[in-house]
Amino acid sequence: MFSNLHLPLNPIDKVNQPPVYYLQVQDGLIICSGLCWTTAYILYIRQAYRDKSYGMPLVCLCANIAWEFLFGAAIPESAAQVVSFFPWFVIDIGIVYTTWKFGREQWKHAPLVAQNLGWILLGGIAGMLVMFWAFLKTYDNRYEAGFYLAWTDQIIVSTTSVAQLMSRNNTSGHSWGIWFTRWIGSVFAELIFVWRYWNYPESYPVAATHVTIFLFIVTEVADLTYPFVYASLDKKEKKKLK
């Protein structure tokens, strides 16, 4: 009964008409990635209330909101994108709120930022929306444009999360759960494109470009650096409590 079930076809799959097993593996990876990232976003909000802080760096939060609004609501390419990205957009609004609510304390060393954090968030989101829209209008291949925007956003999330831990010198706003679900979600996302390229290289050349390989490698290096930095800071914090 369920052997032929799969998510609605994306534009490339409509042309290729791949076998059901290909679609189901692809769908499984999409669903796993989506569930992991959804969990990570919820954990960001929970940790914000626990620590009275925020964990997602400002630049990548603004980029996330812009990307998820564009591809989850404004100009989605498929029903699968709406199902995946619009819920993230809704949850991300909660992250924006907790960042605004608790972020001012984190920026008390920079009063100009602390006093204008709401405007900085609004301006950052608006700026990212315009920049992403301009990139999509400039790039002929919308699929590849969306891909590069998504993975540029991803590399920003991964690298700035490590940088934020190091600059704060504490783990406030962060947790092992956030890191693990975010990292595994990214691994599943990478595997989606590996699977697609393995089966249809002529349809997904973007997955094997030098830029893509760079984005994937740097993302993994940053994500695998994070736990070492977090563990070091967590150990110091626990020593202080003794």
UniProtKB/Swiss-Prot annotation:
Subcellular location: Membrane
Protein name (record): Pyr4-family terpene cyclase mfmH
Positions glycosylated per UniProt: 170
Family: Belongs to the paxB family.
Keyword Hydrolase attributed: no
Biological role stated in the UniProt entry: Terpene cyclase; part of the gene cluster that mediates the biosynthesis of the phthalide-terpenoid hybrid 11'-O-desmethylfendlerol. Within the pathway, mfmH catalyzes the last step and cyclizes the prenyl unit of 5-O-farnesylcyclopolic acid into a drimane-like structure to yield 11'-O-desmethylfendlerol. The biosynthesis of 11'-O-desmethylfendlerol begins with the NR-PKS mfmB that forms 3,5-dimethylorsellinic acid (DMOA), which is then transformed into the phthalide 5,7-dihydroxy-4-(hydroxymethyl)-6-methylphthalide by the cytochrome P450 monooxygenase mfmA and the hydrolase mfmC.
Enzyme Commission (EC) number: 4.2.3.-
InterPro entries per record: PaxB-like (IPR039020)
Enzyme category, top tier: lyase
Biological source species: Annulohypoxylon moriforme (Filamentous fungus)
Assigned keywords, A-Z: Glycoprotein, Lyase, Membrane, Transmembrane, Transmembrane helix
Record's bilayer topology term: Multi-pass membrane protein
Signal sequence bounds: none
Transmembrane segments: 25-45, 55-75, 80-100, 116-136, 175-195, 211-231
Pathway connected to this protein: Secondary metabolite biosynthesis; terpenoid biosynthesis
